[in-house]
Structure formats: C-alpha cells, structure tokens
Amino acid sequence: MAEVSAREQIIFDLASMEWELFQLVHNTGGRASCQDDPDTFFKMRMSQWVVYSDSVLKSCMEDFQEAAAQGRNLIFEKYGRMMETTHPEEYERVRQYFPEISEQHRENVEKITAIHLEWDKKTAEAYPYLRKNGRLATTREDSADGISMESYLRGELQCFSEKTVELILKETEEAVKDGVNLQERMIENEVRFYGYESLERAEEAHRSREGEEA
C-alpha cells in the first residue's frame, strides 16, 4: 500500500471535518439526500481542495479548528449564508449567528468569485454536456430549488478568515496570469475520481448518454 503524503492527509482531513460538520446541519425541509452520500461528498470536496497549495490547506484547517473552539460550525454558516438568495426569510432568522465580515474581506471574496465565473463560462463552452450536469452558474438563477456555483462559492469564502481568503485570492490571480483555469481543474479532478481519463473522455460519455436518452 502506498504511503499517504502529508498533503494527501490534510486534504482528506479537511473533507472529513467538513463531512462531520455537515452531519450537524439541520435543513428546515428535512435531511438533505447529499447528507447520506459520503462517496459523492468526498469526491467533490477533495477535487476542490487538491488545486490549492499547502499554505491554503493549512490555513483552511486552522479556520475550521478555531471555529470549532468557538463553538461555531463553518458548514452551517456556509449554507446559512447561501440562503440569502434561495430562502431569504429563513436567512433573516439565522444571519445573527454569522460573524460580521470586513469590507475588504467582502471585496476579496467578490474578486475570487468573479474570476471563477469567467472560468466557468470557458468550461461550459469547452465541455457543455459535462457542465450541464453541474450547478447553475449565476446568483440571478438562484431559487428555492437550487443554488448556483456563484452563490455557493461566495457563501463558502465568506466563512473563511481574511488570511485564508487573501491566500486563495493570491493563488487565483496567479492562476489567471499563468493561463490556468482552476474551476476546470476541479472538475477534471472530479471526473478522474469517477474513472474518466480526462475531461474530453467525460464530455464524450455525457454527450453519448444524452443522445441515448433523447
């Protein structure tokens, strides 16, 4: 059996911590189906974490640990913040539990989110069938039936510390300069978890499947 590296361990530990906290989140509409699907959850979360540096991973872990020491659940806060656009009335009832964030923090979150939106457009153009199976793209598409990639990312980033968000912004902007699409990298990691050799192979499989169902 191959030895697990320190980097692989922290990625797994982050996903594990998120999963445990996710189990403590109570949805007003009842338990969500994804709360009973650890396989999909771990594949999706680890696919995201792996694109970031060790510095970001360690900073995120520190955020989770510090929040836990304060009796806070960052996953509850993440999904709670998302409700601002999907369930505004419920959001008003829970927003008091979320720490205030500075204007600079908010601006940094929006910078990262804007870049991911551009990356998402490019990914959708290159892999339309594959992208069609993901979340909605923009906040204006949010409803009680679903949350967009934009709102999900915003809600998640708002929960992390200013230090963590600054690190993520730095790496996001560096990726732009290097011509790297981190949003696409995340999806590529995910399809590999499902056995596809590449995004191209996954796209072809989804195209064929849709053709068979038509």
Where in this protein do the model-derived segments appear?
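Basic/polar N-terminal segments that are highly enriched at the extreme N-terminus
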Residues: 1-2, 214
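Polar/charged low-complexity regulatory segments
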Residues: 2-36, 86-89, 96-143, 176, ...
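Short amphipathic alpha-helical segments that mediate assembly, nucleic-acid/protein binding
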Residues: 7-8, 42, 54-57, 105-108, ...
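A cross-kingdom feature marking solvent-exposed beta-strand/loop segments within repeated
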Residues: 28-51, 58-63, 74-76, 141, ...
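Short, structured motif recognition centered on aromatic/hydrophobic residues
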Residues: 49-65, 109-113, 157-160, 164-172
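Extended intrinsically disordered, low-complexity coil regions enriched in Ser, Thr, Gly, Ala
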Residues: 56-58, 62-80, 164, 173-188
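Short, structured interface segments
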Residues: 79-82, 86-87
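Alpha-helical oligomerization segments
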Residues: 163-214
